[in-house]
Amino acid sequence: SMGRGLVRDDVSAILFDEPLTVIDPHLKWKLRRKLKQIHEQFNLTMVYVTHDQLEASTFADKIAVMYGGQIVQFGTPRELFESPNHTFVGFFIGSPDMNLIEVDRADGGVSFDGIHLPLSDTLTRFLSDHPSDNIKVGIRPEFVHVWDEASEEALQCDVTACEDLGT
């Protein structure tokens, strides 16, 4: 389909449906880079369907994340990573996935397991405008820091597991 799309004048978009699924990792990396070069050279819209979030994040200018047959968020890879607006997006984008903690409303914030987590004025207003009791806080593991001493700006907790990622 890509060849026909490149030689015809009446094509404005090319659809790729899992094009790199059964290709070995090294060749996949080379082909992904080549597709990106072709995209930039010909300035065609490419719709790239994949279940591989790394592939989507490195290839795409914008990503549409689907869940249950519906698009639940559309944005840049950075927007999806930093500000997921659906729990599936938080789970799907990033590795390891986002930790989701069910919380309860509390004055000026939320609470869980006896811990009060203050929220910004913007988030507090957002919660007051949305009466749902289904509230979750998402924490990306790479943004967690371990400190030797207690701090008012940190949450005290017990580390129960640590995964060595080799870095």
Q: Where are these predicted regions, by residue range?
A:
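Generic detector of ordered secondary-structure context
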Residues: 12, 81, 95, 149-151
